[in-house]
Each structure stands twice: as C-alpha cells, then as structure tokens.
Amino acid sequence: MCSSDLLVGDVALESDVSLMEELDDIHHPEGCIREAEKLAAEVYGSDRCFLGVNGTTGVIHGMLLGALRPGDRILVPRNSHRSVLGGLILAGLEPVYVQPAYEEEWRLTLQLSPEQVEAAFARYPDLKAVFLTTPNYFGLAADTKRIAAIAHEHGAVLLVDEAHGPHLGFSDLLPPGAMECGADAAAQSTHKIVGAMTQCSLLQVRYGRLRPEAMEQAMSLVTTTSPNYLLMGALDGARAQLAEKGAAMAAASVRAATVLRKALHRVPGLPVLEKELNGRGGVVALDPGKVTIQVSRLGITGPEAADALRRAGIAVELVDQDHVLFLVTYADDNPEFPAIAQRIATVLEKMRKPRRDLPPVPPVLSIPEQVLTPREAFFAPKERVPFREAAGRVAGETLSFYPPGIPLIMPGERLTKELIAFSLQLQEKRLQVSGPRDPSLQTFEVLV
C-alpha cells in the first residue's frame, strides 16, 4: 500500500476541492472555468474550447455526438483509434471506411490523402463528416488544409483527432495545427506532449457548421458531474505555458531531437525517419519531436530493443515489431541529454545481429460488406464460434494483424472464406494478432 503523502503533497490534496459556487460548474460555466475555456480558445484560434477530464476518448465521443445525428454517414480511416469506434456506437453513425496508404519499406501506415477524400465524396455524396487523425502516433501529418476545403465544398464538416498535436501551431518549426488549417473541431491530448496531467484533454470547436447548443449538450453528456479541479487547473496551466513559451518550447524540443537523431544516425544500418515520407500517402509533414527508428533492420524486434533500453534506464514512447519511437520534448533540452542519446545509440549498436528476412507485408484486402452499423452490432446478441467455420457470419469484434495494423474486420461486417483463410495465413507467419478476445483465433465472436 502507498499512502497519499507519498504520492502528492499537502498543496495538491488541499486543491482537490469539492464543488462550490466560487469554483464554477463545468456543465454551465460562467466563472473561472468559462474564463479558462475562453483563454484556451484564444490560444488555439477556435470559437469555443471545452475542458476534457475523461481523456481524449471522452472528448472524441462528445465531438461525434455533438457534430452529427444518428444515421449520418462519416468517412473514417480504417486505422482510427479505438475511441472512434466507441463514438460511432454511441452516436449511431454509419462509417464509410477508407484504407490509408501503407509504406512497405518503412512498414508504416501513412495518412488519408485529399484524393481519397474526393473519391469518397464522389461515391457517397451524402457524407456528413470526414474524420482525420493527424498527426498520427509517429508524427506523420496529413494535408489538413486541403481535406478541410474538400469537406466544406461538399457541405460536410472536418473532425480531427489531434491527440498527438496539442503543441502544433506555436512555431514554424512544427506542422500547423488543425484549427489553423480549417478543421471544424479538434480533440487534443494536452497530457501527451504539453504539460497537463494524465487524463487532461481539450476540444476545440469552430462554429458555423457546428451548432453551439449541440456541442454543449454532447460534452455535458460525456462529462462527469464531479470533475477534478487539479485536472482543470493543469489544463489551464498548460495553456498558459504554451501562450507564453510555446515557440521556445518547440525550439527546445527540436534541438534535443536533433541531438538524438545525430547519435542514432551513427548506428550502422539503422534507419532513422526524417522527411522521406513527406509527399507519400497523404503525408505532408513530420513532427520533429517524434523520432522513429526501424530496429528490424538491425536484426532485432522492437520489443527486444525496448527491453534492452529499459535495462539501460531508457523508457521509450512506443514500440511495435519493427520500430521504436522516442518522444522528445522541451524537457529533454538539457546538458545531460547528449550523454543519454549516446547511451541509446550504444545499446542499439551492441544489439546488432545478422539481418533477418522481415516477414512480408500482407496485401490489403478489400473492406468487407457492412451488414450492420457498429451500434447495431454492439447491441446485437452474440456467440462464439470456431473461427475457421465463421464464413458468412457477421463479426461482433475487431480483428487486425501487425503489420500493417489495419483492421481486417470490424463489428457489423461479414466474414468471408477469403478473409478467414488470409487471417490464418498471417497467424502462421506469427504476425501479431490484435482485437479479438481469443487471440489464438480458435474462436471468434459473431452475431447470433
């Protein structure tokens, strides 16, 4: 057991206050919360900002609920975060999925391109929204400005998952932010990169195409009636820090990232992602604070590299079978960081093995027939059946493999013999299974 005084000090405990008139009401803000929202909206150039205390998952749910109506069609990249599926279920939306491009040399999923968005509107002119995740976890940014213009030309709104971009737009060293590029709403994980506490997020909204009362009602619906004032205070503090020092923080982050990149480039045979993917698969820019290395080219896996680095006192941001991702922030711009960067490079160089043949990247199958919406599939009765015998049944859960990490099947879609056979082939090649409750694929959940 760990006592509270070992976790937080007296000031933090005293700040964990109950609801009082002086502290405003997050559901009907008129005082200090309203002022915090107003200041955050000014910083990001939005018409309204909502404080999120249930992470960006809650903010994405509120964004989808407030922007659209049940039955509306929305264009969704196939590799969107799991919170988007939750929002589709809650809001009763009909997704039109699109496969983002996949870069085989780097073994990375790229972005949704303007051309894909245009093609989607040509086929589905009744689309009410485009959902875009930019930048993605690896810092690859989409052409948000062009996609916003296309959506608006067709009378639709652009909703952005900007979880990995709350710091964008404060410096020319970084890609522009979603609101600057014309998005109608953007969900930002203020806790991921800038200085707010875990669980802190913001929803930026531009009115005109979105109704104020609908967004307010939706955010109230997904927000607790007992919000933690430490979290809301942390959001306001992060906003103030960005307003005062955003450009300097960006410059510090880029300096530190450059130090790390130089050290990693000295490791023979180790690819370090720079700007070579710009102009491919809808990617127009890279967040320089995200440093991605392809360790599979050293004959090792991502988890092997991450374990070795952890033993050396280095925690990484993200790992998959091929890559290790380092998140470099302004806090890393210090005299000790060059030695840390060199330690990382030394660990990796010592791990080099004779290069192994990488498992082939599986071809992308066509998106299966959508029989039911995600909401209909969620509430439908289900049963578990042998996966090999599930052809013709409607999926009750998601199935994907890494690489490339794009779902082969989503809830409400029909399983086919081709898809099942393909999945079993990928499993035999020991690609990582993700999604189903039974990762062995002996059984799979389907609708009754």
Positions of predicted regions on the chain:
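Short acidic (Asp/Glu) and glycine-rich catalytic loops that position anionic groups and cofactors
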Residues: 212-216, 234-243, 284-289, 318-324, ...
